[in-house]
Amino acid sequence: METKLDPVVRQLADHLSFLGYEAEEREGKNHPYLYLRHQRNPNFMIDTFLGAVKCTVYWGLSPEGLAGSLEMFTLLNELNRQALGFNIYTDEDSLILELVIPREYSKASFGAFWSVVESDFRLVMDGRLGPFLS
């Protein structure tokens, strides 16, 4: 079966599989994307958008998160200051982490880049956001 998955996204999937991620190709509105799972890290999507490759994590918001408290937004501002790769924000019902992945793939540079991504995952998953997530 021939895939329409972006070749760079395919390379990233192969690399992430080596790091313990399970990649599943899914059909999006306009083109396929990857959905990735890991035992210790959040599930996320890798997709293309306007020629860029992006990684997106979605978490549902709890009733406290949906209320949009000053405490939550203060914490999000703090996390955005500390995060090295992700932009962290909310929409109507989700907390979203989003970053652009370099299109030029090399094993060494992507490995270093991904260690920054996993550092941001740990930062966000440290428990402080717990009351705001469903």
Name each model feature, range by range.
Residues M1-N43, R81-T90:
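Charge-rich, low-complexity N-terminal segments
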Residues L5, V9, G65-S69, F110:
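Generic alpha-helical secondary structure
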Residues F18, M125-S134:
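Charge-rich, low-complexity terminal tails
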Residues N30-L34, V53, L95:
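Hydrophobic residues embedded in beta-strands of well-ordered beta-sheets
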Residues R37-L66:
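Long, continuous compositionally biased terminal/linker segments
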Residues T56-I96:
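Short, internal acidic amphipathic alpha-helical interface segments
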Residues G85-F113, D126-G130:
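Well-ordered alpha/beta subsegment
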Residues F113-F121:
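Short amphipathic C-terminal alpha-helix that caps PH/PH-like domains
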